[in-house]
Amino acid sequence: MAAAGSIMAFDFGTRSIGVAIGQRVTCTARPLTAFKARDGVPDWQQIEKLLKEWRPETVVVGLPLNMDGSEQPLTARVRKFANRMHGRFGVQVVLHDERLSTVEARAGLFERGGYRALEKGKVDAGSAVIILESWLEQFPE
């Protein structure tokens, strides 16, 4: 399933982690999945499976910041997640500002499907899409 120039994104949360895949060529992304985390501990086997299947050249992890750009309590956990992903799997991992990605994902899902579309997994995977598309716009090459 891997294609040259594929990029994977993660929207890290303490209960759920959204995942998206995208392409540099088209600068587009689509949701892949969301999976549960236990108090911020991800299912590393699930991540390994996704990385082996898609073989992304880069992994983008959304970095939660306050609106003024300062860090929040979750920021350190996201940095730890990104560092562990790099250490475990040897993939290139970059952090990207994710401010308002969940708000934007919820609004888009609601617009397309009302309240029924606002399932947690869909919101998290949708947030990963927004994070990835934002990163692709900022770093197209």
Curated annotation (Swiss-Prot):
HAMAP family, per the entry: Nuclease_YqgF (MF_00651)
GO biological process: rRNA 5'-end processing
Alphabetically ordered keywords of this record: Cytoplasm, Hydrolase, Nuclease, Ribosome biogenesis
Enzyme Commission numbers on file: 3.1.-.-
Main location: cytoplasm
Family under the similarity heading: Belongs to the YqgF nuclease family.
Entry function: Could be a nuclease involved in processing of the 5'-end of pre-16S rRNA.
Molecular function via GO: nuclease activity
Signal peptide stretch: none
Superkingdom of this protein's organism: Bacteria
GO cellular component: cytosol
Cell compartments where the protein resides: Cytoplasm
Protein name stated in the entry: Putative pre-16S rRNA nuclease
